[in-house]
Amino acid sequence: MPQHDQLHRYLFENFAVRGELVTVSETLQQILENHDYPQPVKNVLAELLVATSLLTATLKFDGDITVQLQGDGPMNLAVINGNNNQQMRGVARVQGEIPENADLKTLVGNGYVVITITPSEGERYQGVVGLEGDTLAACLEDYFMRSEQLPTRLFIRTGDVDGKPAAGGMLLQVMPAQNTQQDDFDHLATLTETIKTEELLTLPANEVLWRLYHEEEVTVYDPQDVEFKCTCSRERCADALKTLPDEEVDSILAEDGEIDMHCDYCGNHYLFNAMDIAEIRNNASPADP
């Protein structure tokens, strides 16, 4: 059985092409467990999670990447945020009926993919591509060609393992400033495309790589764990409350007696009463309950 929730980087020594392989199960379950999403929405979040994990592994600096789908369809928002430590969180917003067999375009409607790269130090970069491809992988490949002009292929699979949702994916990318022939890259992509969902989700990573590339010279690096981690906190909620007009905050307090701030990512609730609000206004952080 594979070790899920790990990302593996590898390098083709003879082609100056790098690769990544990731499988997720527990991380995906934690993202889904606080929501009653229809199955097609779960599938999209699984694909987004895999894609974000693969993309964050391409970062050469500390920071995070957000991959977001937006549109006018019944799923008008789906987003996964992850950082270079492979800590992930995500959420979707559903505002209409979802057909059981809805594909990506049916879910999102007229929309686009937004990729936001936020370094720990330096300026944020945002790229936007129209939802023109039939799959998320195709849209992201288009993004790479437009933004980084690096030949890139993504292969994403979703399914179940032992009755629990799981997903996996692989990325191939030509190394920057290398003279890899397109035919060589296409050859590796053709090999990778043969991966079956069952193989990717149930076999150890080294066996998957051997099955695909046993005739190539491949260096495999130590894996990196992938995990769910939400960055919400009582302090961040307090900071958000500072940005609201006092009249609005006082109105909620008068009506409800307290303010309940809910994190869509993890389901946590943070409650603030009148005394807490007074402390916030005095620039004092409210004590954790």
UniProtKB/Swiss-Prot annotation:
Entry-linked SUPFAM superfamilies: Hsp33 domain, HSP33 redox switch-like
Matching Pfam families: HSP33
Disulfide bonds: 230-232, 263-266
PTM: Under oxidizing conditions two disulfide bonds are formed involving the reactive cysteines. Under reducing conditions zinc is bound to the reactive cysteines and the protein is inactive.
Record GO biological process: protein refolding
Cellular compartment(s): Cytoplasm
A GO term for molecular function: protein folding chaperone
GO annotation, cellular component aspect: cytoplasm
Entries under CDD domains matching the protein: Hsp33 (cd00498)
Keyword annotations from UniProtKB, A to Z: Chaperone, Cytoplasm, Disulfide bond, Redox-active center, Zinc
Family stated for the protein in its record: Belongs to the HSP33 family.
Job description of the protein: Redox regulated molecular chaperone. Protects both thermally unfolding and oxidatively damaged proteins from irreversible aggregation. Plays an important role in the bacterial defense system toward oxidative stress.
Protein name: 33 kDa chaperonin
Organism: Shigella flexneri
The gene coding this protein: hslO
